């Protein structure tokens, strides 16, 4: 018993305990809502490049739980995407639909497809030709965040617009 008490009082044990306690209290950083919020700033990319699209326009939108309805914040991002795609017609796009880990594989694949289709339909309504767009669903197979909390799940409920090079 005395050995345990002497170890507990040693400066090394106290320092180790304090460093573990401080590390356990690390705060979480807020993640960006879309790629345009990555802090790289407007104008950091060559106009018309895929980096320009990702940084200055935003390549992803997010959805509410079990929903494929385009939210108001997503409508703004998609409107900017449509304008950019009309300005640079050499690009075609693939719209990836994603879901969080909750639900069956089949349900999440179907939900991801509905999200990709809703995104495609919105862009088409803003003048992007449908022959320049294709959709694919990854369901819950490609999460960007992995944890058992809504902070992660909400990042995985998304549609990502991927640029394909000219002539594709």
UniProtKB/Swiss-Prot annotation:
UniProt xrefs under Pfam families: OmpA
GO BP terms: cell division
GO CC terms in record: cell outer membrane
Residue stretches in coiled coil: none
Protein topology in the membrane: Lipid-anchor
Localization per record: Cell outer membrane
Keyword set includes ATP-binding: no
Lipidation (S-diacylglycerol cysteine): 25
InterPro entries per record: Bact_OuterMem_StrucFunc, OMP_bac, OmpA-like, OMPA-like_CS, OmpA-like_sf, Pal, Pal_lipo_C
Lipidation sites (N-palmitoyl cysteine): 25
Assembly behavior: The Tol-Pal system is composed of five core proteins: the inner membrane proteins TolA, TolQ and TolR, the periplasmic protein TolB and the outer membrane protein Pal. They form a network linking the inner and outer membranes and the peptidoglycan layer.
Protein name as it appears in the record: Peptidoglycan-associated lipoprotein
Lineage of origin: Bacteria, Pseudomonadati, Pseudomonadota, Alphaproteobacteria, Hyphomicrobiales
């Amino acid at each position: 018993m005395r050995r345990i008490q002497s170890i507990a009082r040693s400066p090394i044990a106290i320092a180790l305990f304090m460093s573990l306690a401080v590390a356990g209290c690390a705060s979480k950083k807020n993640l960006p809502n879309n790629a345009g919020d990555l802090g790289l700033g407007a104008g950091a990319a060559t106009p018309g490049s895929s980096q320009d699209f990702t940084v200055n326009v935003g390549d992803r939108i997010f959805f509410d739980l079990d929903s494929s309805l385009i939210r108001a914040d997503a409508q703004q991002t998609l409107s900017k995407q449509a304008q950019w795609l009309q300005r640079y017609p050499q690009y075609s796009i693939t719209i990836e639909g994603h879901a969080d880990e909750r639900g069956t594989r089949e349900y999440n694949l179907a939900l991801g497809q509905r999200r990709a289709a809703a995104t495609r339909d919105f862009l088409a309504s803003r003048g992007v030709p449908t022959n320049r767009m294709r959709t694919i669903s990854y369901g819950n197979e490609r999460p960007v965040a992995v944890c058992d909390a809504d902070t992660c799940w909400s990042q995985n409920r998304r549609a990502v617009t991927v640029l394909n090079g000219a002539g594709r």
